Amino acid sequence: MKLKEQKKFGILWLSIGAALFLFCRYTLSVYTYLIEDGNFVVLRTLGKKISPICSVSLKTGIAIVKMPHTAAEKEEYRKKCGNVRSRFNYCRTLSPENAYAFVLDFNGRKTELLFEPNEEFLHSFEMVFANVRREYLRELYGDDGESGDA
């Protein structure tokens, strides 16, 4: 084999190895979502290693929204959430059908945390978030939060 062919063959094998590594690294990760002490926490499990990779206060939250798929849904999403500056994807699959976004204000930037909850977690998250949001607005405005833009 000529030297050029050997280099091409080596690059091909290196590319295949890198692709396999990235595929295993990101698609074999399992995400666990928790509500803990008023925070939304995301844990990533890769093999036997469990790492906390995200923890944000529910007080910074703006909305929990199902991710849009159609053009009409995308327009409605833009109306509700506005211009999102940052996005962090904590979904278990590459193209999730039932992904949700926890939209929050992070250091003055509107940010999305994408996650793929089961129905039970989603229901609990929505209830806890609504309570935390209501209490936070009471702290800010000293009433039931009706005077703020929720």
Give residue ranges: language-model regions.
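Generic structural motif
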Residues: 38, 45, 61, 67, ...
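Conserved beta-hairpin
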Residues: 21-57
